[in-house]
Each structure stands twice: as C-alpha cells, then as structure tokens.
A protein has these predicted regions:
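Helix-to-loop junction immediately C-terminal to a conserved catalytic motif
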Residues: 62
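ABC ATPase NBD coupling module
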Residues: 78-92, 116
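Short coil-to-helix segment of the ABC ATPase nucleotide-binding domain corresponding to the Q-loop/switch region
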Residues: 104-111
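Conserved ABC ATPase "signature" region
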Residues: 115, 122-141
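Conserved signature/switch motifs of ABC ATPase nucleotide-binding domains
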Residues: 148, 166
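Hydrophobic anchor residue at the start of the ABC signature
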Residues: 160
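The conserved cystathionine-beta-synthase
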Residues: 276-303, 308-312, 319-337
C-alpha cells in the first residue's frame, strides 16, 4: 500500500482472483473466472462490448453486486470479509449521473464522507477547500452554490471531489465523463490525468470508448461478451500485439494511428527548425503535445510543418507531415499481430 501525508493510504493493490458472477435466472454468467492484478496507484480501464460485464466487475469491488465465486482483495484483504459500510466509505465512487444531493451546497456534498467518519470540523473545512481548488473550481464562487446552478462539467468535478474527500486508496469510476459534451469531456479527461499525477490513487475506470481507454489507462482489461477476459496489458502492448482477432477488431484497424496518441513530440526525433525569418505563419505546439494531435494541427492549418516549443515557448525543432507519416508507417508495421 502506497502511503503519503497525513498517514492515510493513497493507493492500494486490487486483485480479482477467479471471480464469477451469476445473475439469477440467466443461463450464462455475467463474469467468468476473471483474474487480474491492478498495481497500486495505476488507472485500470475496463472496456468491452455490451454484455461484457465491465460495470458488473466494477460494482463487485464495493459489493453493490455480490461475488458468486472467487474473491476480490484490496491490499490482500478480502472485500467479502469487510463490513460493507466500512468498505464503501473507503472507496471513492464516481458515476455518469454524478448523484450530488440537490438540497445540499457544494461544500456540504463534498464533506459528506468526512462527516460520517467523524473528522473535526476544521479539518473538513480545509479538506473541502483544498479539493474544490484541486478539481479546478473556485472555493469563493462555488463552495456555497447548489448543484442546480452548476454546469454538467462543474457537477462532475464536484462529484470527483466528493469521491476523494476521505482520501480513499481506491476510486471506482463508471463512465464518469459519458454524459458530457465532447469538448468538456476532453478537458475533464486531461484535468483528471494531471490530477492523478498528484493523488496517485488506484482507479478502476469503466468506459465503452476505446479512445478514452487508451488515453486514460495505465492498463486496459478488454472483456468479451459473458465477462471473459480477452486481453489485459498496457495500451501500447495491446495496440502493438492484440491477443487475438477479437481484440484486434475491437481496438480497430487504425492501431498505428492510435499508438501515435500515446507518444508526445518530446519522445520523437525532431527536425531542425527553419531560420526565424522563415517561421512566420508556421503553426506551433508544445513538446508535450501528442503526435496524433500535432498531425491534426497541421492538417487543419493546411501547413505541412509545425514548430515544437518547450515550456518557455522556445522553439526546439520542427515536425512535418512526412515525418509523422514515416513514423505512422513504422508503428503500423510493428502493430501487425
């Protein structure tokens, strides 16, 4: 278990050990013999077609759905042996519909679990303010606001803050960004990834979107219909060498292009930038930009070249469409199973 600050656990290893779930009246199990280990501090994305059991698997962790056979452990402790209230208070839970209490202000929504745990009022106030800032909201503007006055993206941020309020070692996120418009969704994804670099929680994240899975996951578990594990690995390894035809079809034919979304401009060999007199009109992007996004910038601008800058805005080099095309060709060849 990873420890940080205040003596609380910040992350926990999660193990699914030959887990099954049978819904009453159904001939086929929803989850069949699922075994995987999620290292402490990583984001594991569960994905698969409809009927793959991804949400069922997630809800067995906090016992919203019972385990029919097998076990799930949190840092070696069986979830089935724990008091269910204690278990759920120690797990952050974020869902698509957010589920904020409409009659409670933002600050009171976030404070719900710390109050149940008996934290001192002063500590709760400090934690609430810290979390409101951490998720990108303004405590002065939003703390005493009711959920009905917030946008969908703001409500999702408050839901995230509430899930983190008691500093749980594990967070369960069931399609948390699925009901938000694409622009806000991308912003929330980026903000959560930056936030995760700070909080380093173990996260189990359910989505139906393979691009979101590739972006968000340290590891991805692809489930077949019937809850059978098809492939569990890093996004890079899944895209490079899918386990079988089902996985290859599921991730899509453009695996090479998807792999470009895993690399930043910082990670590729840049071309020399042209003299300053030849730079006006050239688009630019920071070296932290994904290679796939850099390609989109060039195609959108109609310019085949793009300047690459560091955090201070200094030009470090240049990429071209030809360079990325050659890189794409290389990744596609290596992605052939």
């Amino acid at each position: 278990m990873v420890q940080e600050g205040r003596g609380k656990a910040t992350a926990a290893e999660i193990v699914f050990d030959h887990v099954w779930h049978h819904y009453p009246g159904r001939a086929v199990a929803a989850i069949q013999d699922l075994s995987l280990t999620i290292p402490a501090g990583e984001i594991c994305v569960l994905i698969g077609p409809s009927g793959g059991g991804k949400t069922t698997a997630l809800k067995m962790v906090n016992r919203l759905i019972p385990i029919s056979k097998g076990d799930i452990t949190i840092d070696g402790r069986s979830v089935q042996s724990m008091d269910v209230i204690e278990l759920r208070r120690g797990i952050g839970y974020v869902i698509q519909q957010v589920g904020l209490f409409p009659h409670m202000r933002v600050e009171d929504n976030i404070a719900t679990t710390p109050r149940l745990l008996g934290w001192p009022d002063a500590e709760i106030r400090g934690r609430v303010r810290e979390l409101i800032e951490l998720v990108g909201l303004d405590p002065e503007e939003h703390a005493r606001t009711y959920p009905s006055k917030l946008s969908g993206g703001q409500r999702q941020r408050v839901g995230l803050a509430r899930a983190m309020a008691a500093d749980p070692p594990l967070m369960l996120m069931d399609e948390p960004f699925g009901a938000i418009d694409p622009i806000t969704r991308e912003r929330l994804q980026d903000d959560f990834l930056r936030l995760h670099q700070t909080i380093r929680k173990t996260v189990i994240f359910v989505t139906h979107d393979i691009d979101e899975a590739i972006k968000m996951g340290d590891r991805i578990a692809i489930l077949r219909p019937g809850g059978l594990l098809a492939h569990y690995d890093t996004p890079e390894n899944i895209l490079a060498k899918p386990a079988d035809d089902f996985v290859a079809r599921f991730v899509g034919a453009d695996r090479g292009l998807k792999r470009l979304s895993l690399r930043t401009l910082r990670e590729i060999e840049l071309l020399d930038a042209p003299p300053e007199t030849e730079r006006p009109g050239l688009p630019s992007a920071s070296e932290g930009t994904k290679v796939r996004d850099a390609l989109s910038i060039m195609l959108t601008s109609g310019n085949p070249s793009l300047l690459v800058t560091d955090g201070e805005g200094t030009v470090r080099g240049m990429v071209t469409i030809d360079l990325i095309t050659a890189l794409l060709s290389t990744t596609e060849r290596s992605a052939v199973p």
